[in-house]
Amino acid sequence: MKFNVKMLSVTLGLFTSHAFAHTVYENARIYTVNDRQPTASVLVVDQGKIVYVGGNDGAKPFKATATELVDLEGKTVLPGFIESHAHPATVAVMEAGDFVYVDGARTLSQILSQLKAYLVAHPKANYLLAQGFNVASLGLPQGALPTAADLDTVSESVPIVVYDSGMHAGWANSAALNVAHVDANTPDPIPGKHYFERDNKGNPTGFMHESAMHNVVDAQQFNAVENVAEKLQPILKTYHSLGFTAITDVGDTFSTTVAAIARLNEQGKLKVYYQRGYFYDAAKSTEQNIASLKGLREKYHQGNLSINLYKLFMDGTIEMDSGAMYQPYPNGNVVEPFLSQKQINDNVAAALKAGFSVHVHAIGDKAQQSILDAFAANKKINPQLARVIAHNQVFEPQGVQKFAAMKDNLFLQTTPNWAVMYEKDETKTKIGQDAYHHQFLLGQAAREGVAVTSALTILRIPLMR
C-alpha cells in the first residue's frame, strides 16, 4: 500500500450546476500533488471548500457566475501543509508561564544574566520557564552540569526551570523543586534513563533528564488547563499563517494538555486537523498503556481532534550522551535503548492490534536498529496503519535498506533542530567520524522510494512572536 497525499477536489466537472456563491482564483501556478494533473492555473472555492482545480476552459462556467474573481498574477499555490511531528501543546505549557528563549550558544553566566534581567524587567513574574541551552556551550568543566544553586543566584523565591535545546534535559532552582516536592526520597521515573542528578548523599542537584524534568514543570502553578488552552490558540493561528492545515502533536507527559486541546475542540476553536499522541508510561504495563490510550480516544476523539497515535522513546539525544549508540561515548558510557527488544516488540504489536499508529523517537544508530527490527517483526499487523520513526539522526549500517523494505507503510520523519551548526564539532567528538558521516541519510532513503517527512518539532517562541 502506498501513502500519497491527494487533493480532495482535483477532478474536473465536480458539479453540474454553478449557481452558487464562489470565488475564482486565476492565473496561478497551482501544485496539486496529483500525478494525473500535477499543475493547474485556476482554483475555485465555495463556502470554504475547493470545488474545482484545473485550466481556464473548464473554469469558464465558474467565472461566469463568480462572486469574486482574484488574479494571482502567477503566484504559487500549494496544498495545505501537514506538520508531521510537533509539540504545540508543550509550547502552550511553556507560554503559560513567563517564558525566556535562551540561545543555545550562550554560556552559563550569560544565561544567568539573561534570566536576572528578565526578572528585573518583570518584577511581578511568579515563575519563569526558559528553553534553549546546550550543555557543551555552558563553559563548564568536562562532565559538569549546572545545578539548582546556579539558578538560586537568579532567584530563591521565584520557581525557575530551564530546558535544554532538545527538551530532553534541564535544570531547576530550589523553589521549583520544592513546589514539585522533589527531594532525596523522590524516585527516578526510570532509573538511569529518566532521572534526577544527585549528590553523594542522594539529594537532587537540580539537573534532570527526560520525564523527571517534565514532572517538575507539570507541578508548577501556571500549568493549568485554562492557561494552556489560552496559549495554544495563538500557536495554532501561527501554524495557520504558515499554511498548515493538519498537525501531528506526538504528545507529552503534562497532565493539562489533552484537556486543553479538547477544550478548544469543544469550543469550535480547533481549526486544524489535530492528531494527538499518547506517551508510553514506563510505570504501566503494555496492556495498561494501551487501555489508557483507548480511554483518551473514547473521551476526546471527535470533530477535528483524533487521538490514535502511540508514542515510544528509544533513546534521548546525542548532546546529553543519552542517544543509544553502538559505540561508547568518550566518557566510556554505553547507552542502550530505553526499552528492551522484547518490550519494543510487545508495545508495537499491541498498539497496532488495537488500531493505533505507532510513532517512535530514535536518535542513535542502535535505537534506530531496534525499532526498525520491531517494525519488521510486526509488519503484517494492520498494514494500513502508518508507522513512523522520528528524527533519525544517526543511521544504523542497514538503516536505509530496512526503511526501503518497509516503505509501503513506514515513514522516515526528521527534524532540523538536531542539525545545528554550533553542535557540529561536539557531535563529531561524541560519536566519531564513521557515525558522524551516517547522519541524516535522507537523500539515500528518498532515492529508494522511502517517504521522508520534515517537521518543526517545537514551533520556536521567537518565530511565534
Swiss-Prot record:
An example Pfam family from this entry, by short name, is Amidohydro_3
| UniProt xrefs under SUPFAM superfamilies | Composite domain of metallo-dependent hydrolases, Metallo-dependent hydrolases
One GO MF term on file is:
hydrolase activity, acting on carbon-nitrogen (but not peptide) bonds
Instruction: Report keywords, A-Z.
Output: Signal
Signal peptide feature range: 1-21
Q: Look up keyword Oxidoreductase and say if it applies.
A: no
Q: Family, per the entry? A: Belongs to the metallo-dependent hydrolases superfamily.
- Name the job this protein performs: Involved in the control of extracellular enzymes production. Stimulates PEL, PEH, CEL, and PRT production.
Protein name, please?
Answer: Exoenzymes regulatory protein AepA
| Organism, scientific name | Pectobacterium carotovorum subsp. carotovorum (Erwinia carotovora subsp. carotovora)
